A protein has these predicted regions:
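Generic structural signal for small/hydrophobic residues in well-ordered secondary structure
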Residues: 5-6, 40, 82, 108, ...
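Alpha-helix capping/helix-boundary segments
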Residues: 8, 36, 78, 104, ...
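Residues that scaffold the ATP/ADP-binding catalytic core of kinase and kinase-like folds
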Residues: 11-12, 40-43, 82, 126, ...
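Active-site neighborhoods of divalent-metal-dependent phosphate/nucleic-acid chemistry enzymes
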Residues: 71-114
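Acidic, PIN/NYN-like endoribonuclease modules and their adjacent C-terminal/linker elements
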Residues: 1, 105, 111-137
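Short, well-structured N-terminal submotif of metal-dependent ribonuclease cores
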Residues: 1-36, 44-63
Length: 137
């Protein structure tokens, strides 16, 4: 099992990565952070007016996409780990501006899973998180 970053799920949704998806599928189910679900839902909310057919279609498409994965909540251990990551990076003078990625990394760390991402530079500076580059996956 691996934790997939939002960048990977967006790429899967866009298509054209069948070989990578086949490799993931061979490895079993994978995990998403609730943060990824929030980011994907935000796209639906910003691109479509609620109550429209386009909104319902986008929502249905998102539901089908998310059904392929297990979803991990932002739990107390994840929040605590995220705070520790933020504190450590700030003390090192290497803050990470993207709080979403901090929570995704914290989920990976608490679940002891590698994170698969197209944004390797966001995650490599975080200790105790194994990073797999989606571009070379």
């Amino acid at each position: 099992m691996k934790l997939l970053d939002t960048s990977v799920v967006v790429d899967i949704d866009r298509g054209g990565v069948d070989d990578k998806v086949a490799t993931l599928d061979e490895q079993g189910r994978h995990l998403l952070s609730m943060v990824t679900v929030t980011e994907l839902q935000l796209v639906v909310e910003l691109q479509h007016d609620p109550g429209t057919d386009a909104y319902r279609e986008a929502q249905d498409k998102l539901t089908r996409l998310l059904s392929r994965f297990d979803i991990h909540p932002v739990s107390r251990p994840v929040a605590t780990t995220a705070a520790r990551i933020i504190g450590s990076l700030k003390q090192q003078g290497r803050p990470l501006d993207d709080l979403h990625d901090v929570y995704i990394a914290a989920t990976a760390r608490t679940q002891q899973l590698p994170v698969v991402t197209a944004n390797v530079d966001h995650f490599e500076r975080i200790d105790d998180v194994d990073v797999i580059d989606w571009e070379t996956f």
